[in-house]
Amino acid sequence: MLDPKLLKEKPQVIRDMLKARAVDFDLDGLIESDQKRREFIIKTDEFKKRRNEIGNEIAQKKKAGEDTSTILDEMKNVSAELAKLESQQEEIESKYAKLAFTVPNLVHESVPVGPDDTANKEMRKWGEIPQFDFKINDHIDMSENLDLVDLERAAKVAGARFYYLKNDLVRLNQSLIHFALDFLAEKEYSLVQPPYMINRSSMEGAVIADDFEEVIYKVEEEDLYMIGTSEHAMAAMHSKEIIEGKDLPIRYAGVSPCFRKEAGAHGRDQKGIFRVHQFDKIEQFVYARPEDSWKEHEKMLAVAEEFYQKLEIPHRVMLLSTGDMGKISAKTYDIEAWMAGQNSYREIVSCSNCLDYQARRLKIRFRDKTNEDTQYIHTLNSTLVATTRVLVSIMENFQTKDGHIKIPQVLQSYMGNQKEI
């Protein structure tokens, strides 16, 4: 949700953003409903004021023993008109809210303008692409050869894009989680295991409704949705709160399973564990002062880069274009890991600054002193590790000639000093 002052004072800023994002949005309708909303607020306030005045006059007349029939008629007329205005105002507010909650976020000036991922900008690379003197396998074949994943039985009990992790891949998955939590705890992140389901108002605060309804699972006959990431729950964690400025920044490390419909995935991604409906993820989430949020954004990215350097996974950092990044983000970096079996880089991290967009929707503010005005806080989020995708990268990049998988050195202590699968 954008600052309403922009609609009134700088609508061209929003028009420029919509053009850069190539988004079809009824901005004129939003501006018009905002103007009408303001007008109705003034009108209803005037009628409420008059109603209170009449109420006082009635009390005085009754106390003085005077006739109140005429003024009671006026009270009846004013109350009826007020009820009519409030009904109209409710309709206008509903239209305004629907549009205000779907307009995308502003875009940082450094973001490349383009229609899709072809306009993304490579910022840097790390690590050497592994070279093999033998025919390599992708993770799907390796999973079958080493009995690490059972896709057929998962499809039987749950459908496509589910899986059973088995044997040492279960341990490797858990080692990634434990290493990630230790890594963030050392950097003074507070560890959080959130609810795996949240209500609609919380989900709408964290994500644009049209977007989440396409990818998030709804719990039937309940006001609950399965989280697609712990970001959703952590964004809503401080909803309707005023945070003390001295406590900022707040850095959370969220650990949770994630549930996504992943509609539209095709090709090789329909098999294996790269693109699935359920996976484990460790997420960075930060509440920051407005003046600090861009610094925090770069810091979160650096934390994620360091994590993959420790895992010795070759990767690159991409700055997403206006056509490829999410609507709630003002700027997004992706980290893409090298997948040897696919001979390409694939996304494993998304790191975004949402400015005050989520905070306005969720009513999260901060203040420095008790008697000072409050400000909307800035929220930022970044994947640290979505384990199934990183398992794919490890399986493909660390495979050996005899068909085994070398365990990254930093994870060996989490697996009883085991060196290979």
From Swiss-Prot:
Q: A biological process (GO) annotation for this entry?
A: seryl-tRNA aminoacylation
Assembly, in brief, is: Homodimer. The tRNA molecule binds across the dimer.
* Annotated compartments: Cytoplasm
According to the UniProt record, what class of enzyme is this? ligase
Entry GO MF terms:
ATP binding; serine-tRNA ligase activity; tRNA binding
Q: Which cysteines are joined by disulfide bonds?
A: none
State which gene encodes it: serS
Q: Which residues bind L-serine?
A: T229, S230, E231, E283, T383
Q: Which UniProt keywords apply?
A: Aminoacyl-tRNA synthetase, ATP-binding, Cytoplasm, Ligase, Nucleotide-binding, Protein biosynthesis
What does the record give as EC number? 6.1.1.11
Q: In which pathway does it act?
A: Aminoacyl-tRNA biosynthesis; selenocysteinyl-tRNA(Sec) biosynthesis; L-seryl-tRNA(Sec) from L-serine and tRNA(Sec): step 1/1
Instruction: List the InterPro entries.
Output: aa-tRNA-synt_IIb (IPR002314), aa-tRNA-synth_II (IPR006195), aa-tRNA-synth_II/BPL/LPL (IPR045864), Ser-tRNA-ligase_type_1 (IPR002317), Ser-tRNA-synth_1_N (IPR015866), SerRS_1_N_sf (IPR042103), SerRS_core (IPR033729), tRNA-bd_arm (IPR010978)
What broad class describes the main subcellular location of this protein?
cytoplasm
Protein name, UniProt field:
Serine--tRNA ligase
Reactions catalysed, as given in the entry: tRNA(Ser) + L-serine + ATP = L-seryl-tRNA(Ser) + AMP + diphosphate + H(+); tRNA(Sec) + L-serine + ATP = L-seryl-tRNA(Sec) + AMP + diphosphate + H(+)
The species this protein belongs to is Nitrosopumilus maritimus (strain SCM1)
Name the positions where ATP binds.
Answer: R260, K261, E262, V276, E347, I348, V349, S350
Task: Please give the family membership noted in the entry.
Answer: Belongs to the class-II aminoacyl-tRNA synthetase family. Type-1 seryl-tRNA synthetase subfamily.
Domain notes for this protein: Consists of two distinct domains, a catalytic core and a N-terminal extension that is involved in tRNA binding.
Q: Spell out the GO cellular component terms annotated for this protein, sorted alphabetically and separated by semicolons.
A: cytosol
Summarize the protein's role: Catalyzes the attachment of serine to tRNA(Ser). Is also able to aminoacylate tRNA(Sec) with serine, to form the misacylated tRNA L-seryl-tRNA(Sec), which will be further converted into selenocysteinyl-tRNA(Sec).
Task: Read off the Pfam families from this record.
Answer: Seryl_tRNA_N, tRNA-synt_2b
